């Protein structure tokens, strides 16, 4: 399930997905940046520029990504919170958004894992960004998270 909300010029995306895995297995997968390749659409040309290390608070991760054809952008995030194996937060340090804060949480529910994502984001360029980019970014993020959900089902529902 993917839902969007817009309040005070900050958009919020929420998604939940049940997976037949343990907390440990979910943490091992989601806390490793190298697995982002497996759940990001190929057309985004996603590339991580930093070494893959065990996640820790304060960790900086640099990426290159193409959110739109022929448009490549650098993106730097910082891991600002880690509670293994239940939650972590990454925040944009620099990149395409005025604000990007992605909270990942994992909990057991009916002998399955419930993976929850809450992404708070603010578009650049103020009113112009919201008028011209709001619907486009919402559409893109929806497609990205739909793809991610399908890939996670393929990986873990074998």
Where do the model's predicted regions map?
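Short, surface-exposed coil-to-beta transition loops
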Residues: 12-14, 72-76, 99-102
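Beta-strand elements of well-folded, non-transmembrane domains
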Residues: 19-21, 67-69, 81, 96, ...
